Amino acid sequence: MRVLYVFNFEYPEYLSDTIYHGLIDLGVDVYETHYPSYMLKSFDRLDQIYGRGFTIFGKLNHTPKVDTEEEIIDKIKSRFYDMVIYGCVYTHGEGFPKRQCLDYLDEVIKYYPKDQVHFIDGSDSSWNFAHSFGLNSYGSIWKSHLVDYGAGKPLSFGIPESQLIKNRPSKEKIFATIVPGKQDTYIYHNEEEYYKDYSVSYYGTTFKKGQWDCMRHYEILANRCIPYFPDLEECPALSLVDFPKEIIKETNKYARRNEIHPFYDEINDYLFDYIKNKLTTKK
């Protein structure tokens, strides 16, 4: 399958980057409209990326296929691509480079049927840009912070398979060091130390920040640690649709009391199998 991935890669966008990573990892024949610099192993400025470049960035050993604008338009007209994916369709506030990318839309909607075009919206906002501007007439809308089934389909983040821990670590403490939002707990400057802290902890704290989905949820699970997700009860049905919410709600009861669940090991094994089978970028 040949896929045209329309995204400018100006700045990381977790949902878009999850989808892109998964396509490459699955061996799909991807053609990029822009050079995906920060996704490649050759990228040498990971420390300047949001989240210190951990987990999904700088991981791909991949040679991008970026054609000229003229070549891309010719291939669209000839229906060379089997699918067209728009990686970031939403607008956002000041402070970020412009990630919205709707390049070639006029050509795509002229030459491609609706079932071969997909619009990805990983915005923290529940406002649905793609639906509000009628993009649903030209393709499928996929959104991580979805509130209405009629306005699109729910889609969640994923973690690269390569990031799943390879061993079964011994636990040393109840809670991992990092507490989201508390800057004095952000003490890890490399991925290995960051992951190790989760791996030796029974629970890792996480909760809704900008939106319900967050790479941190998956980083915790990937290191055989159980998320302590205190506000999960408030999560709407169409957010975190693939996340094991009910099990985490059960373990929350014990984490809240600084207690280890009596079936912690069994639950942890189940959750690790769950992330491996359902929550990687390949899934």
Question: Locations of the language-model features?
Answer:
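Short beta-alpha junction loops
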Residues: 9, 35-39, 89-90, 121-126, ...
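A short, glycine/small-residue-rich beta-strand->loop->alpha-helix junction that serves as a flexible
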Residues: 6-16, 92-94
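Extreme N-terminal starter segment of soluble prokaryotic enzymes
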Residues: 1-3
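Conserved alpha-helical elements of sugar-nucleotide-dependent glycosyltransferases
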Residues: 11-22, 100, 104, 213
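Catalytic binding pocket for nucleotide-activated donors in carbohydrate/polymer assembly enzymes
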Residues: 5, 17, 24, 32-35, ...
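A short beta-strand-loop structural module common to alpha/beta enzyme folds
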Residues: 29-44
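Catalytic core of nucleotide-activated saccharide and alditol-phosphate transferases
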Residues: 80-186
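Glycine-rich, highly charged phosphate/nucleotide-binding loops
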Residues: 50-76
